[in-house]
């Protein structure tokens, strides 16, 4: 199973996601794609099997992923303070992969019905990649 974790900024959420996925599904191949080198480095240190940085890396890896995990901003062009390009958002949305999106209320995007919670709490309520069937 190919699991793609996408994150930007400092990679803090991505780091937590990589660690959680590796623990929940140790046999999965986890690819970390950062919108910048800091995010990529944080996810690689958390145990990603492989990593890359930038727009083209997102576009290429969305083609082969079984599951894509990241903050909801990865499907919104110009989110994450402009780090998500329209091409990145389109690649995530058009991928045949199952998307597991973490509801983060930042950058003028608010998810109605989702209270502000610490990221750790959200990770425990996220579906496991094993739930994909």
Regions found by a protein language model. Give the residues of each.
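Short, ordered loop/turn segments at secondary-structure junctions
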Residues: 8, 35-38, 56, 74, ...
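Short glycine-rich or small-residue beta-strand-to-loop segments that form or flank ligand, phosphate
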Residues: 2-7, 68-75, 100
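Ser/Thr/Gly-rich flexible loops in soluble cytosolic domains mediating phosphotransfer, phosphorylation
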Residues: 84, 89-123
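Glycine-rich phosphate-binding loop
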Residues: 50-88
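Single conserved hydrophobic/aromatic residue that forms the stacking wall/gate
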Residues: 124-133
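Glycine-rich phosphate/diphosphate-binding loop of Rossmann-like nucleotide-binding domains
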Residues: 4-34
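Hydrophobic/aromatic beta-strand patches that form the interior of the parallel beta-sheet core
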Residues: 31, 52, 98-102
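N-terminal beta-loop-helix "entrance" segment that forms/cooperates
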Residues: 33-52
């Amino acid at each position: 199973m190919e699991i793609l974790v996408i994150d930007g900024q400092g990679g803090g959420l991505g780091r937590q996601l990589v660690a959680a996925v590796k623990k929940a599904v140790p046999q999965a191949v986890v690819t970390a794609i950062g919108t910048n080198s800091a995010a990529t480095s944080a996810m690689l240190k958390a145990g990603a099997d492989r990593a890359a940085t930038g727009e083209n890396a997102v576009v290429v890896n969305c083609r082969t992923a079984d599951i894509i995990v990241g903050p909801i901003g990865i499907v919104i062009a110009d989110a994450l303070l402009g780090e998500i390009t329209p091409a990145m958002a389109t690649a995530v949305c058009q991928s045949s992969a199952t998307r597991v999106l973490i509801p983060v209320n930042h950058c003028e995007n608010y998810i109605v019905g989702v209270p502000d919670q610490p990221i750790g709490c959200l990770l425990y309520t996220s579906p496991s990649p094993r739930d994909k069937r």
